[in-house]
């Protein structure tokens, strides 16, 4: 791919991303405004029910809720372009600051979980492919099937019951103990159970995918040729099969980033873990428009971005797709 075509390629990707985010923001804004509930309750609490009609009208004017929905959106979009995403009704501070205060916990839980899922699924998939049909393969298959069928909220409650209530060896809620915000060991202990749920809930699917892809590659004609040259099954798998499997695996893992982070939202709620998951639940419950809008926009933008990254990985790494692109470029040139 030549330099001008690369610029055009990434320019198209950037334009597609911006247009998708624009449409997403408009859709989320309209849906959040049309949802049932009273946002003044979030802002004023119990006092909202005691407001007179005149005071209610003044409050709606103050928050910009008296304007048409499209006018509200245009005003929100103009402010958002300058980095102003509005004030959280519940926390009485900028929505971006509220999210920033919680994002670290979610990124820690989701980031460590994603790295463990990526590493362990790759290792498990390779081991199961090498030992196809053995007791190890069957045991992993059965364990994965059972674990994958358990809902994350139920698995969370089960681990809390066993390790936090019965055995009392691990904390079952929060991100740290009172007064232990800077204690790394205490934070790590609070991370173990939620992290276990996140990893167990996603690990097996990707391990199965790696195993099946490797087994498909092992049946290809080039593997017979490699074995005829004296290469062992292990060498063929590592040098050839794994290399051909990685583009698909990397693109699927890129798409899965939002899915893994979305899984942490449920886990955070069950474990009362102070991250974006509990924040999203609170913003929806209290109809905190600005906070809910920014959370939804960030989540949607992450999904769109990861989809584009996955597509780019496939197009840039997979030699078959690169060859097709080269043929198309050659046909376009005079």
Show which residues each predicted segment covers.
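Membrane-water interface segments at transmembrane-helix boundaries in multipass membrane proteins
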Residues: 142-204
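Hydrophobic alpha-helical membrane-insertion segments
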Residues: 21-27, 146-161, 253-258
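Hydrophobic alpha-helical transmembrane segments of membrane transport/permease proteins
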Residues: 21-71, 167-187
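Hydrophobic membrane-targeting alpha-helices
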Residues: 26, 30, 34, 127, ...
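An internal, D/E-rich "acidic patch" concept
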Residues: 3, 65-122
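Alpha-helical transmembrane segments of integral membrane proteins
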Residues: 6-8, 103-136, 181-334
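Charged, compositionally biased N-terminal leader segments and the immediate start
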Residues: 2-34
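Short hydrophobic, aromatic-rich alpha-helical segments embedded in or entering the lipid bilayer
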Residues: 51-82, 271-282
């Amino acid at each position: 791919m030549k330099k001008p075509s690369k610029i055009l390629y990434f320019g198209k990707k950037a334009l597609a991303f911006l247009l998708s985010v624009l449409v997403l923001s408009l859709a989320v804004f309209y849906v959040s405004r049309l949802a049932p509930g009273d946002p003044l309750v979030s802002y004023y609490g119990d006092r909202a029910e005691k407001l007179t009609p005149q005071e209610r009208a003044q409050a709606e004017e103050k928050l910009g809720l008296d304007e048409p929905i499209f006018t509200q959106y245009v005003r929100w979009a103009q402010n958002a372009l300058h980095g102003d995403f509005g004030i959280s009704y519940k926390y009485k501070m900028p929505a971006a600051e509220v999210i920033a205060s919680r994002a670290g916990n979610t990124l820690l839980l989701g980031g460590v979980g994603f790295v463990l899922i990526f590493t362990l699924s790759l290792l498990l998939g390779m081991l199961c492919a090498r030992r196809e049909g053995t007791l190890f393969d069957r045991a992993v298959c059965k364990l994965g099937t059972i674990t994958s069928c358990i809902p994350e909220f139920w698995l969370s409650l089960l681990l809390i019951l066993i390790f936090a209530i019965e055995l009392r060896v691990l904390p079952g809620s929060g991100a740290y103990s009172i007064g232990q915000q800077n204690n790394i060991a205490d934070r790590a202990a609070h991370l173990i159970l939620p992290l276990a749920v996140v990893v167990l809930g996603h690990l097996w699917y990707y391990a199965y995918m790696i195993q099946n892809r490797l087994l498909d590659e092992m049946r290809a004609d080039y593997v017979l040729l490699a074995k005829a040259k004296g290469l062992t099954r292990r060498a063929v798998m590592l040098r050839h099969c794994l290399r051909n499997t990685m583009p698909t695996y990397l693109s699927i893992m890129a798409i899965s980033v939002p899915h893994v982070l979305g899984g942490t939202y449920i886990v955070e709620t069950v474990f009362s873990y102070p991250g974006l998951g509990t924040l999203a639940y609170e913003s929806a419950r209290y109809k905190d428009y600005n906070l809910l809008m920014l959370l939804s926009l960030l989540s949607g933008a992450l999904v769109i971005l990861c989809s584009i990254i996955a597509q780019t990985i496939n197009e840039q790494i997979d030699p078959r797709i690169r060859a097709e692109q080269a043929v198309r470029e050659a046909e376009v040139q005079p």
